[in-house]
């Protein structure tokens, strides 16, 4: 492997670690309810105050979060494919695909989401600073809104004038999956 391959491998590992944290954050966020966040905020938790504000408009946080999850996973998979194709050819790509599927499913999705289900409050509060940043980071927010606008052009319709765009029950069902 060349020095470039090693650098790419480090990037893949970092992206995978970020993806794991984002999976935990996503599940914790969708499972957290306003009542519990309000109780934690009343106890003086600054993170709970931020979480409560984000729960008032969950679509803003979820749009940015899901976009970032997609970017980290696709970039990681692509870079690993490039590395393995360069070192082992077509067989390396196949190995990379299988490796990514197993790692992303078990380590990158199931484990962090299970943790978030079992420790919802702790995971939600732990991930709040990152979610708050993502929700308020203008370039990511604008990109997310722009891509949603493109989707609305591709799939036109009246749209919804008022939320909730997704019910709390639907979010909890998605988190359980």
Placement of each model-derived feature along the sequence:
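Membrane-embedded alpha-helical segments of inner-membrane proteins
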Residues: 1-177
